[in-house]
Every structure is written in C-alpha cells, then in structure tokens.
Amino acid sequence: MKVLLVTGVLGLLLLIKWKSQSTSTSNQTCQCPTSPWVIYAFYNSLSLVLLLCHLIPEIKPIHTSYNTHDSSKQQHISINTGNGK
C-alpha cells in the first residue's frame, strides 16, 4: 500500500510538472501530451485517488471513536458501522 502511495504522489508531481511545462510553452504547435511518462503520471495519480477513497472509510471510524463527549453519538456511529458491514 505504501508503494501505491509513493507512486501516486510521484505521478501527481510529474503531472504538475507537465502542466507547468505545457503552459510555459503554449506558443508551440505540437505539445505532444500523450508521451509515456504523462500517461504514467496520470495512471499513478488515479491510483492515488482510488487508494485514498479506499482508506477514507477506514480512517473515519477511528476519528469518531475518540469523540467521548457525546456517548449517544458514539453509539449511533457504532450501530451504523455494524449494520453497514
């Protein structure tokens, strides 16, 4: 999972670098946006988004379990996660 996170961040950085290069050289006629490393960067940033969407439901109950001020809210959350699985 850490490998996906690292490659996703690298892909996002490559995509940002490509975007900044394409805006600085906008007077050229052929920018060739389908070079292999741009496709690789797009794929890695997409995998990062999918990884984060997969991890967000797992992180949410951890944050809500530390909320000890409202016990009825805690019971409501635990019932919802129990029925959801």
Swiss-Prot record:
Effect of residue 6 to A: In strain: Infectious clone UK
Residue intervals on the Cytoplasmic side: 24-36
Record topological domains on the Lumenal side: 1-2, 57-85
Bilayer topology: Multi-pass membrane protein
An annotated GO cellular component: host cell endoplasmic reticulum membrane
Keywords: Host endoplasmic reticulum, Host membrane, Membrane, Transmembrane, Transmembrane helix, Transport, Viral movement protein
Location in or out of the cell: Host endoplasmic reticulum membrane
Coiled coil: none
Superkingdom field: Viruses
Gene Ontology biological process terms, A to Z: transport of virus in host, cell to cell
Transmembrane segments: 3-23, 37-56
Broad class of where this protein is predominantly found: host cell
Function: Cell-to-cell movement function.
Stated family: Belongs to the carmovirus double gene block protein 2 family.
Record's protein name: Double gene block protein 2
